[in-house]
A protein has these predicted regions:
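Short acidic, S/G/P-rich loop/turn micro-motifs used as interaction or catalytic elements
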Residues: 231-232, 257
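Hydrophobic/aromatic ligand-binding patch that stacks against planar heteroaromatic rings
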Residues: 86, 241, 269
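Short beta-strand and adjacent tight-turn residues that come in two discontinuous sequence segments
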Residues: 63, 97, 227, 279-280
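Substrate-binding cleft of secreted/luminal carbohydrate-active enzymes
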Residues: 20-21, 248-252, 256-346
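Active-site metal-binding loops of divalent metal-dependent hydrolases
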Residues: 172-173, 229, 253-254
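Active-site mouth of glycoside hydrolases
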Residues: 1-222, 236, 245, 258, ...
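Active-site neighborhood of phospho(di)ester-bond hydrolases with catalytic His/Asp-centered motifs
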Residues: 205, 227, 250-253
Length: 346
């Protein structure tokens, strides 16, 4: 089956509230695997933090899965159902991300990395990982059946589940140096997803992906247009460009204080243009995305020094937070931000 018509996409979008939320990872997890693996699934923290999100006025979140979770399918599905029940109780509809080209390669199930002090997303895992992406690009296709099974079984299982808002099938294809080597896997994923054709819309971002062919492929196949924008100077020009496609638009990543895409700057622009929006990060925790991207350059040296944060240690803070909104104790980074968001959403 093909992508939705523009008319169907607009009809779906009109039936949603104005979408506002965060890219969500519980503060007790360092990555997607730690969030859902049975050994580390933290139902209490997820409940607490999604209650905070609902109280702030958020009605959606964006959450990443991982292909390796399908290797422990039975345990994962139990935890995913618990997660969906919590979301539903808080009137939050999750957008689910399936693949991702960002951060650490060579993902593995089991015990995950300890956080590295002051390093942005030091343990986030690519899915399926650049090594597999490169193999597929080079014509080595032995991983394709496993990946197809993950994509199609997830989409089929939840294809009529009204608790799920939307499927973001591949986050930022081409990022972290892989470039247009991701095009072959992305083509497969679009084909697999459209074969299932779930009742929810399908997307993969335009701005945020790397490579003209990749961006064009996402544009041609997405039911809903999605994009990422962290620099205030580019936000309105990106929106102007995307409005010409004449489909509903959602910004699935924004809010880097250092680059000016604060809530105070961004939310009025999104609301004026009827664009849903998901800032990066909610409660600062093991992923440490309240530290800036530049800290990633220190990752190898931090590993060499074994500069880890152990379970009994607190999370350090930069003077100015890059992403995220709250601390683990529930206190906000900036109460003025909280006041602004709540007043804006009244």
């Amino acid at each position: 089956m093909n992508k939705w018509s523009a008319e169907k996409a607009h009809e779906w979008y009109k039936n949603q509230e104005w979408l506002i939320g965060a890219n969500f990872l519980p503060s007790s997890a360092i990555n997607q695997l730690e969030m859902f693996q049975p050994e580390t699934f933290d139902e209490h923290t997820i409940k607490t933090e999604l209650k905070m999100a609902s109280a702030l006025g958020f009605n959606s979140i964006r959450v990443y899965l991982h292909d390796l979770l399908w290797d422990i399918k039975k345990e994962f599905l139990v935890n995913f159902e618990k997660f969906l029940v919590i979301c539903d109780k808080e009137n939050i509809k999750p957008m689910i991300v399936l693949f991702d080209d960002c951060h650490r390669s060579n993902p593995k199930l089991g015990k995950q990395f300890l956080p590295l002090k002051g390093i942005h997303n030091s343990g986030w895992s690519q899915s399926p990982g650049h090594e597999i992406v490169k193999e597929i690009h080079e014509g080595k296709l032995d991983q394709l059946p496993r990946l197809k099974k993950f994509i199609q079984e997830v989409l089929s299982l939840y294809s009529e589940d009204e608790r799920i808002l939307l499927w973001d099938i591949y986050n930022e294809p081409g990022q972290f140096g892989i470039g247009e080597n991701s095009i072959e896997l992305l083509q497969h994923v679009w084909g697999w997803a459209l074969e299932v054709r779930p009742s929810q819309p399908l997307t993969s971002c335009m701005h945020g992906s790397i490579g003209e062919k990749i961006i064009e492929l996402n544009k041609e196949n997405s039911d809903i247009i999605t994009f990422h924008a962290y620099e205030s100077k580019n936000l309105e020009s990106i929106i102007k460009e995307l409005l010409e496609i004449r489909r509903p638009i959602i910004c699935t990543e924004y809010m880097a204080r250092e680059f000016g895409t604060t809530f105070e700057f961004s939310l009025p622009i999104f609301k004026k243009n009827n664009i849903g929006c998901y800032n990066w990060g909610f409660v600062a925790g093991k992923s440490q995305t309240h530290f800036g991207w530049e800290t990633i350059l220190n990752l190898k040296e931090s590993v060499r020094k074994k500069d880890f944060i152990f379970e009994d240690e607190g999370i350090p803070e930069p003077k100015v937070w890059f992403h995220d909104i709250y601390r683990k104790d529930g206190s906000p980074y900036d109460q003025k931000e909280i006041n602004f968001i709540k007043n804006f959403l009244k």
